[in-house]
Every structure is written in structure tokens, then in C-alpha cells.
């Protein structure tokens, strides 16, 4: 506590319910899946960066051919990520602050979990109506990520089983209506 400002302490405290750091073996498998699918580089987004572990374990051959951007809501891990990856465009802000449809070649993330989705000025009305009862934090990150992928882009999302087998099917129905291939 003595090392943090009141604002930083509040931010760290608020993120304890939705933050989770992805193990290295999982991250390496995420990148292996992208390579298997033929991904060689491009515009990559990590919308829930933490300290940037997913970027840190990116294979060098992909990294050399990529432009990386990311978002981290919590200022402490966001500042760490900025120090570790100075060439990446990392914003210490919520993913809901901007929307860039059809612009990313790959999205690689372990989505945050929670029952309440952020208020996104660009997507809020559409998604709240279409995902009735299933508009939560992890479904928001997945759907927005899919909308930001270019045609032919690849997304690797770590999520809970509730995304695909939860009682409320609205998110699955919306995702299946998008022009994406799910693997």
C-alpha cells in the first residue's frame, strides 16, 4: 500500500475480480495455433494486456513482421507493459474507449471475466440488444475482437466454457451470425 497512490490502489483493488495472468505454456500454445493456421505477422491486438505476457512470448519471426497494440485498464501493469514493450502501441485505458472495425490481422487474448460489460459508446446499444442477458465482460471482449478483425484475420481467445455452453445462447447466436470461422 505505501508504494501506491490512492488512485493506483483503487485501480489495483478493482481489477482483482477480473484479472488473471495467463501461464506461459498456454500462451506458447496460442501462438503455435496461430502459426499452424499460417499467420506470419501483421497488425496484432491484445485488448487485455496485463503486463504483456502474451506479447512477450510471441515468436520472434512473428514479432519482426508485426505492429502490436494493446489496452490495459489498470495503470500499474499497463506502465510495466509500456516499459517492457516500448515499440508496441499500448494504451492505459479500457478496450471500450475506441473501436476500429476490420483493422486487425490477429487478436490474441485471455479475455477478462465478469458479469458486467463496460459501457462502449460505439457498440453499447447494438450489443446490449443483441446479447440480451449474455452481455457480460468476456462476451463483450470476444464479440468486439471479432468485429475488429479484418476479413481473413485470426483471433485466439481464452474464455470460459460459459461462452459456448452457458444457458443463455444469445452470445453464441450473435457470434455464429458474424462472418467468421470458429475453430
Segments predicted by a language model, with ranges:
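Conserved acidic residues
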Residues: 42, 105, 181
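Class I S-adenosyl-L-methionine
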Residues: 1-84, 88
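Mobile active-site "lid"/loop adjacent to the S-adenosyl-L-methionine
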Residues: 111-141, 163
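Conserved Class I SAM-dependent methyltransferase catalytic core
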Residues: 75, 133-183
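Glycine-rich, phosphate-binding/catalytic loops in enzymes
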Residues: 62-63, 87-88, 123-127, 172-175
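General small-molecule cofactor/ligand-binding pocket signal
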Residues: 69, 91, 183
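A short acidic, Gly/Pro-enriched loop at the edge of an enzyme's catalytic core
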Residues: 99-108
Amino acid at each position: 500500500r505505501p508504494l501506491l497512490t490512492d488512485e493506483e490502489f483503487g485501480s489495483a483493488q478493482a481489477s482483482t475480480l477480473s484479472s488473471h495472468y495467463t501461464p506461459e505454456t498456454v500462451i506458447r500454445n496460442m501462438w503455435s495455433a496461430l502459426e499452424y493456421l499460417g499467420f506470419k505477422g501483421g497488425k496484432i491486438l491484445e485488448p487485455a494486456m496485463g503486463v504483456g505476457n502474451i506479447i512477450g512470448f510471441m515468436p520472434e519471426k512473428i514479432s519482426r513482421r508485426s505492429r502490436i497494440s494493446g489496452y490495459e485498464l489498470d495503470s500499474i501493469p499497463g506502465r510495466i507493459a509500456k516499459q517492457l514493450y516500448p515499440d508496441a502501441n499500448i494504451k492505459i485505458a479500457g478496450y471500450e474507449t475506441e473501436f476500429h472495425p476490420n483493422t486487425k490481422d490477429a487478436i490474441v487474448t485471455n479475455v477478462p471475466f465478469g458479469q458486467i460489460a463496460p459501457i462502449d459508446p460505439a457498440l453499447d446499444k447494438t450489443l446490449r440488444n443483441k446479447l440480451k442477458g449474455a452481455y457480460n465482460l468476456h462476451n463483450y471482449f470476444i464479440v468486439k475482437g471479432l468485429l475488429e478483425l479484418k476479413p481473413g484475420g485470426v483471433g485466439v481467445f481464452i474464455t470460459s466454457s460459459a461462452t459456448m455452453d452457458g444457458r443463455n445462447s444469445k452470445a453464441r447466436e450473435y457470434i455464429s451470425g458474424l462472418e467468421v470461422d470458429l475453430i
